[in-house]
């Protein structure tokens, strides 16, 4: 049976199974897949899952590794990327909430997991890419000052670095949601967009994409469309960079300010602006009883690389990673030399 003959309900169930395999980053059996699906509100029996997996094998989407279970193939990844777009609308908003919940970073103790964006590029571009990246961090245009660096075959979180490539992990802005959630502060992520900065100060949003209405991360879209000017902002203080807008309960403002300070001390700072209760922030209206925050896009330093015509493949909100494995961006060159990347 070919892909065209699969009805919508079957395709959706198959996509759910493929997503479980993709998120796991390792082979899984039908029992583990079923447990994960049920946790997400999808109830499928093991026999049914095995039937779907057998069909996935026939289509080349999954590979049977015997007792180890199945793993997702490149063809399976392509199928997920092209799945029914109507089913993916709102996916970004759901992933933001999921990762914030899964993250367990303790800002007081400075331990636990944080959320990373993963960007891969050719080894031959490592030297100029690191230079562009560090310039953006020097100007304070990243989410904090910590990064991860992976050589071919290494892992950043559950993501394996491809052969002939290096990978850079930048802290995702959703990390701030997780830090607030640990303090019982519920955060609403309204949209991602582009912010115009002048002399290093944010002025206004020039473009916005709501998370609820998008199947892709907004900053990924803007970077691919070459709509940022992060490198120019790093050099002159004037430019356009990625940012996101969040709301939180105004009653929690003192604790929000405390958490922001703790985040900055831990190298995870990135709040560009914090508003007043019920007051607009960068011309964006905020309801009574709420306070607005503008958070720097974690992929901004990567945008500076892309602006230099270096080919980069980025995935926002890609992985959970232990805080202890991150390094200061100033150590990138030394770490790259030690790993044989320069």
Predicted regions, residues:
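Conserved mixed alpha/beta catalytic, RNA-binding, or beta-rich assembly cores of soluble enzyme
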Residues: 1-23, 28-41, 46-47, 51, ...
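Recognition helix of helix-turn-helix/homeodomain-like DNA-binding domains
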Residues: 57, 66-67
């Amino acid at each position: 049976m070919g892909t065209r003959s699969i009805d919508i309900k079957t395709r959706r169930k198959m996509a759910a199974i493929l997503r479980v395999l993709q998120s796991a980053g390792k082979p899984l059996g039908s029992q583990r897949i079923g447990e994960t699906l049920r946790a997400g509100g999808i109830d499928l029996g093991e026999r049914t899952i095995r039937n779907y997996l057998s069909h996935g094998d026939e289509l080349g989407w999954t590979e049977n590794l015997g007792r180890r279970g199945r793993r997702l193939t490149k063809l399976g990844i392509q199928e997920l990327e092209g799945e029914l777009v109507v089913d993916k609308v709102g996916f970004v908003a759901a992933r933001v909430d999921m990762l914030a919940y899964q993250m367990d970073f303790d800002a007081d103790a400075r331990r636990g997991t944080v959320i990373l964006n993963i960007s891969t590029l050719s080894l031959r571009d490592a030297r100029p890419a690191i230079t562009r990246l560090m310039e953006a961090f020097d100007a304070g245009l990243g989410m904090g000052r910590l990064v991860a660096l992976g050589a071919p075959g290494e892992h950043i979180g559950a993501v394996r670095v491809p052969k002939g490539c290096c990978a850079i992990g930048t802290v995702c802005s959703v990390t701030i949601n997780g830090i607030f959630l640990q303090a019982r502060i519920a955060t609403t992520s309204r949209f991602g967009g582009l912010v115009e900065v002048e002399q290093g100060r944010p002025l206004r949003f020039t473009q916005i994409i709501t998370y609820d209405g998008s199947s892709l991360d907004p900053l990924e879209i803007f970077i691919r469309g070459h709509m940022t000017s992060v490198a120019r902002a790093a050099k002159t203080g004037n430019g356009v960079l990625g940012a996101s807008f969040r709301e939180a309960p105004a009653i929690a403002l003192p604790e929000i300010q405390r958490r922001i300070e703790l985040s900055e001390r831990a190298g995870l700072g990135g709040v560009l602006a914090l508003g007043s209760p019920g007051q607009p922030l960068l011309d964006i209206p905020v309801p009574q009883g709420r306070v607005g925050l503008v958070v720097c896009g974690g992929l901004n330093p990567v945008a500076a690389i892309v602006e230099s015509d270096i080919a980069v493949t980025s995935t926002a909100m890609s992985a959970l990673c232990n805080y202890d494995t991150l390094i200061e961006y100033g150590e990138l060159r030394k770490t790259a030399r030690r790993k044989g990347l320069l």
